[in-house]
């Protein structure tokens, strides 16, 4: 099922329960960094519902009291780490609607999520269907279908350009990046700074790459 259809079905269910109240973005490590853009989008643009993020284990062991049938939990893990599978089960048990973002339909995430979004995660990579892109698409659809968001059409149109932009950026930036890396490789400390929608990228760069 496409993300657009998933959100349409979710909205129909929520409309019978009083509407959407809160969206939880749950993951750990690189997956948590990857879904951050969707969180930031909703925190910035949503008017009638709110959004927060949790690490998988925190969500399981310090489950928010607000979590109930009027909530959506977007939970992400490429290969379905045990604590993230448990996070999906925790949200299900509280009556929330779960969207499991994962690497294939064969993972433990796919088996327990009420809805499943399989994102591109290999070579060749489709960046318009990456975990980052899918988290944003979920956010765009929620804003559009629940609040009539006026930037929806432009956001959807932009997806067709993502792969081209990434390919061009790789070609243009790689030589400079390699030169910088060679120059700075012996530095004892690297400070990685970011804000806004780029925070997740900086988190991933700091923890996974440096």
Residue ranges of predicted features:
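Active-site phosphate/pyrophosphate-binding segments
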Residues: 1-22, 123-124, 140-209
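Glycine-rich phosphate-binding loops that contact phosphosugars or nucleotide phosphates
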Residues: 19-152, 158, 195
């Amino acid at each position: 099922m496409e993300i657009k259809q998933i959100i349409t079905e979710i909205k129909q269910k929520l409309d019978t329960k009083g509407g959407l109240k809160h969206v939880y973005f749950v993951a750990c490590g690189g997956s948590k960094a990857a879904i951050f853009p969707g969180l930031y989008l909703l925190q910035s643009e949503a008017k009638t519902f709110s959004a927060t993020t949790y690490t998988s284990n925190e969500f399981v062991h310090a489950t928010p009291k607000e979590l109930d049938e009027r909530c959506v939990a977007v939970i992400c893990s490429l290969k379905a780490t045990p604590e993230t599978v448990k996070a999906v089960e925790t949200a299900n048990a509280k009556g929330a609607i779960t969207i499991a973002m994962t690497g294939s339909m064969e993972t433990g995430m796919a088996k327990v999520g009420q809805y499943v979004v399989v994102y591109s995660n290999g070579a060749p990579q489709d960046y318009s269907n990456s975990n980052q892109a899918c988290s944003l698409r979920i956010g765009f659809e929620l804003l559009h279908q629940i609040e009539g968001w006026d930037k929806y059409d432009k956001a959807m149109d932009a997806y067709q350009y993502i792969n081209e932009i990434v390919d061009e950026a790789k070609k243009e930036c790689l030589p400079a990046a390699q030169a910088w890396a060679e120059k700075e490789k012996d530095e004892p400390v690297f400070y990685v700074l970011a804000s806004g929608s780029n925070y997740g990228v900086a988190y991933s760069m700091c923890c996974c790459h440096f």
